[in-house]
């Protein structure tokens, strides 16, 4: 069944930036019809080229060594990747994408700390032709993580717009983002055409990896467990041998606990494993290798880059039992009691974004979800305090 009718998708624009004077701003949604996409491309390209110039002047090396990746749109992630792509017709984009919540741009991971220092100096100053830098949500260099979420005020002729720019720490080779860096945070225009947000592609990948790598013949102990002292994890889930991270790739999640005899410890006939520390996991970033792991084929690889394509791949290569397990995992990731809120100010918008992907999944795979309305309503009742109010 369909819970919601079609809506045009809006996204992002949730960040609050606080500058070093203690003043704050929330990001606005950027109306692409008002700004005009061709103008959007020109203005933001110039902004990043100017920022690159300032960065090189301060640190004696460029933030982006190959500026052609700005002009071509290659350095951008999420929906920004196709909004900024000069090869995609602007009018065609506007049919399916009326607003931009943020601008996602990749930055070499090793340059993030220097970028933060530069931004600190630029507070309240002009950058590009029509922007003033306001601030970001990272109070110091130790809090950077994988993103700097900043606000630049765009002085447009129709009025100021607080634009959220997410600088994403990414892996670069030869001054360009790697294939996996693009894949891990990318967004497909094919998905935008059916008004489905990129997060659904990554969510579905995570679910598929967990289902394909599930191993009911092992049990999982706590990370601190040893062969002499084993404490089992309190979970009802089937253990998963692998996990998927948009930043790191396909990771081997578990390691066996080895006894004094050199063999894997067993309890009740099941081998005992424990979770590896994140830094100790081995990750696979080769996309063709990840594809073969999931589907046991090299065919139709091009479908791997979009949610729409991934649903097609499930239909082509996965049996009904696997698909049902993926459905259960996917719904729980969207609407489990601790699931992430996507639109932090508006439960209705959050529901629209999530149901777009889930309804498409059900329809294309000919699946049903009894009592879907009740299950979704339960989530919003449980998570009602997770939604913020704009001040």
Predicted regions mapped to residue ranges:
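Short linear clamp-binding motif
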Residues: 3-10, 391
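Helix N-terminus capping/helix-initiation residues
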Residues: 31-36, 111, 286, 306-309
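Structural alpha-beta junctions
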Residues: 53, 57-58, 124-129, 207-218
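Metal-dependent nucleotidyltransferase catalytic core
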Residues: 37-53, 93, 97, 106-164
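Acidic side chains
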Residues: 11, 102-104, 166
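Catalytic cores of NTP-dependent nucleotidyl/adenyl transfer enzymes across multiple folds
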Residues: 144, 150-388
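Helical scaffold of the NTase/Pol beta-like nucleotidyltransferase catalytic core
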Residues: 10-76
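Active-site nucleotide-donor binding segment shared across nucleotidyl transfer reactions
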Residues: 48-116
């Amino acid at each position: 069944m369909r819970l919601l009718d079609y809506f045009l998708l809006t996204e992002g624009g949730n960040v609050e930036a606080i500058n070093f004077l203690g003043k704050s701003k929330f990001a606005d949604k950027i109306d692409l019809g008002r700004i005009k996409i061709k103008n959007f491309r020109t203005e933001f390209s110039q902004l990043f080229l100017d920022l690159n110039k300032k960065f090189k002047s301060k640190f004696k090396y460029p933030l982006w060594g190959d500026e052609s990746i700005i002009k071509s749109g290659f350095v951008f992630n999420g929906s920004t990747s196709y909004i900024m792509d000069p090869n995609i017709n602007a009018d065609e984009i506007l049919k399916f994408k009326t607003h931009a919540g943020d601008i996602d741009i990749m930055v070499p991971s090793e340059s993030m700390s220097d970028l933060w220092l530069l931004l600190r100096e630029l507070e309240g100053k002009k950058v590009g032709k029509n922007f003033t830098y306001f601030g970001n949500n990272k109070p110091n260099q130790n809090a950077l993580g994988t993103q700097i979420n900043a606000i630049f005020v765009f002085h447009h002729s129709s009025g100021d717009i607080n634009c959220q720019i997410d600088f994403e720490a990414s892996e670069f080779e030869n001054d360009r983002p790697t294939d996996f860096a693009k894949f891990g945070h990318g967004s497909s225009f094919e998905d935008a055409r059916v008004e489905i947000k990129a997060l659904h592609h990554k969510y579905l990948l995570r679910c598929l990896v967990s289902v394909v790598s599930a191993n009911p013949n092992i049990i999982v102990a706590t990370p601190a467990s040893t062969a002499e002292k084993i404490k089992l994890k309190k979970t009802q889930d089937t253990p998963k041998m692998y996990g998927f991270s948009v930043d790191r790739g396909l990771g081997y999640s578990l390691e066996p606990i080895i006894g004094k005899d050199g063999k894997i410890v067993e309890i009740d006939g099941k081998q005992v494993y424990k979770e590896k520390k994140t830094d100790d996991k081995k990750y696979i970033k080769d996309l063709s290798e990840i594809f073969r792991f999931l589907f046991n084929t090299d065919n139709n690889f091009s479908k791997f880059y979009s949610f729409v394509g991934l649903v097609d791949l499930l239909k082509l290569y996965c049996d009904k039992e696997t698909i049902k397990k993926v459905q259960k995992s996917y719904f729980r990731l969207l609407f489990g009691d601790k699931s992430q809120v996507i639109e932090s100010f508006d439960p209705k918008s959050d529901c629209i974004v999530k149901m777009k992907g889930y309804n498409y999944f059900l329809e294309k795979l000919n699946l049903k979800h009894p009592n879907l309305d009740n299950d979704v309503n339960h989530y919003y009742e449980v998570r009602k305090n997770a939604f913020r109010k704009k001040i």
